[in-house]
Amino acid sequence: MSNVSPLKIDITDGRLPVKEKGLVFQEFANPAEERRNQLEKLAAGFRLFDYFGFNEGVAGHITYRDPEFKDHFWVNPLGVHFSQISVSDLLLVNHDGKVVQGDKDVNVAAFAIHSRLHKARPDVNAAAHSHSIYGLSLIHISEPTRP
């Protein structure tokens, strides 16, 4: 043990009021306003994935359930790098795999994974899947990894 005198620090100083803690859920006037806000966040999410290295090739996708058309979801197009995705690139896809808004091709793997997820879990509004170089390297190891 050290002979240093403990500091008297008020750890409650500067705390946020309870109402400002945690996630802040926004309220929107209509579904179109909510959609635009969430699509901007979705596009930003792709850029964050790129920034943090979850951008290996074209493997990976993030989806967002449409607030008005609950059986549709927004997804990134095939072949557009995460660092370049903007709201105008995003595709609205129905559960049959048809692109109902957007002019690019949908990633078949993204549709296969996310359509099942969104169907099975109506309480889930967004999902992400990526192939990081670290995760990919683990699948190429010939012997099992140890805990």
For each feature predicted by the language model, list its residue ranges.
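Long, non-catalytic terminal segments
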Residues: 2-126
